[in-house]
Design a protein with these regions (language model features):
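Alpha-helical adaptor scaffolds
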Residues: 63-130, 135
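Terminal, low-structured helical/coil segments at or just beyond the last alpha-helical repeat
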Residues: 36, 55, 59, 155, ...
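TPR-adjacent "capping" and linker segments in tetratricopeptide-repeat scaffold/adaptor proteins
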Residues: 21-22, 52-68
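Register position in tetratricopeptide repeats
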Residues: 78, 112-113, 146-147, 176-183
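Sec-dependent signal peptide recognition
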Residues: 2-8
Length: 186
């Protein structure tokens, strides 16, 4: 398994040898495209953004190792080994608290564990670092829905729509949340 994870991390890194300025420029360009793309093209752009986010921004040994750890944690999360994934993402955050994707992954694990308040705190950290993180904003919508803060959830999804207009989650969730609010007032 460790060898497979190393291969995955190295394949991500093979195409990622860009400096921070180039990375930010690439993200800015992709976000402009995302805002104006139809659904099919937007999914391709979304995948490119996720790829950039999933690679640590520093092109040194430490950055490669942190990327490798993120891949390991993601694998554990996919295998439903949530406590192990939580530990790995926490290690990454200790080493580099400025990498938004480590916070985002840990927020996801916390959500899956039903620890919604803690998940929201991690989402707040993601959004301090990367305010355009549509994954974190969409996750915030889910967290706020679980906490029965339906207006906050709607606002999160509206923020997603500003960044990623063709994303399906807001189109599905906003009407559902409006129904929940309506049902509460009866």
């Amino acid at each position: 398994m460790k060898k497979l994870l190393s291969i995955l991390a190295m394949s991500l890194l093979f195409f990622s040898n860009v400096n921070a300025e180039e990375r930010e420029s690439e993200l800015n360009n992709l976000f402009k495209q995302l805002k104006n793309s139809e659904a099919t093209k937007a999914i391709e752009i979304e995948n490119k953004i996720w790829k950039i986010w999933s690679i640590h921004p520093s092109n040194d040994r430490r950055g490669y190792r942190l990327t490798e750890l993120l891949v390991q944690g993601s694998f554990l999360m996919a295998e439903k080994e949530l406590n192990g994934a939580y530990e790995i993402f926490s290690q990454i955050i200790l080493v580099d608290p400025n990498w938004s994707e480590a916070w985002n992954k840990r927020a996801t694990v916390l959500y899956l564990l039903g620890r919604y308040q803690q998940s929201q705190k991690d989402i707040d950290e993601v959004l301090k670092i990367e305010k355009r993180h549509f994954g974190a904003l969409s996750g915030q919508g889910l967290v706020q829905t679980e906490l029965k803060n339906y207006e906050k959830a709607i606002n999160s999804y509206k923020e997603v729509q500003k960044i990623y207009p063709s994303m399906q989650a807001p189109k599905v969730m906003i009407p559902r949340l409006k129904e929940l609010i309506k049902d509460q007032s009866i």
